[in-house]
Swiss-Prot record:
<dbReference type="InterPro" id="IPR036140">
    <property type="entry name" value="PFN_sf"/>
</dbReference>
<keyword id="KW-0009">Actin-binding</keyword>
<dbReference type="GO" id="GO:0003785">
    <property type="term" value="F:actin monomer binding"/>
</dbReference>
<protein>
    <recommendedName>
        <fullName>Profilin-4</fullName>
    </recommendedName>
</protein>
<dbReference type="InterPro" id="IPR048278">
    <property type="entry name" value="PFN"/>
</dbReference>
<keyword id="KW-0206">Cytoskeleton</keyword>
<comment type="similarity">
    <text>Belongs to the profilin family.</text>
</comment>
<comment type="function">
    <text>Binds to actin and affects the structure of the cytoskeleton. At high concentrations, profilin prevents the polymerization of actin, whereas it enhances it at low concentrations.</text>
</comment>
<comment type="subunit">
    <text>Occurs in many kinds of cells as a complex with monomeric actin in a 1:1 ratio.</text>
</comment>
<dbReference type="Pfam" id="PF00235">
    <property type="entry name" value="Profilin"/>
</dbReference>
<keyword id="KW-0597">Phosphoprotein</keyword>
<dbReference type="InterPro" id="IPR005455">
    <property type="entry name" value="PFN_euk"/>
</dbReference>
<keyword id="KW-1015">Disulfide bond</keyword>
<feature type="modified residue" description="Phosphothreonine">
    <location>
        <position position="114"/>
    </location>
</feature>
<feature type="short sequence motif" description="Involved in PIP2 interaction">
    <location>
        <begin position="84"/>
        <end position="100"/>
    </location>
</feature>
<keyword id="KW-0963">Cytoplasm</keyword>
<keyword id="KW-0020">Allergen</keyword>
Amino acid sequence: MSWHAYVDDHLMCDIEGHEGHRLTAAAIVGHDGSVWAQSATFPQFKPEEMNGIMTDFNEPGHLAPTGLHLGGTKYMVIQGEAGAVIRGKKGSGGITIKKTGQALVFGIYEEPVTPGQCNMVVERLGDYLLEQGL
């Protein structure tokens, strides 16, 4: 299966039990910042934004004072799982990032999608990739 299929079929799909509700944007990005696959709506990010995200996974709390920046958008960092999941909030939307052995799985959402639904979609794919050794 191509990485684009993972994004299309597992991240940008309808939320289970909520037809028509889906993430706004999604991507799978290598730890080095190389994009493996992304939705057409995923923001163009700067290398320093990806470096900040990777630093926060290695040093949890790194982004808390400044916020998480992606594609020029600033998200307030909210409770995640140290070294495994970063969550951010901006207005009625937000972002979830799950770290796997080789990649970061990104999901960006706006209402009516809830933070919990975004977490479920992103973390389910991230856990699957971890099980596959990726």
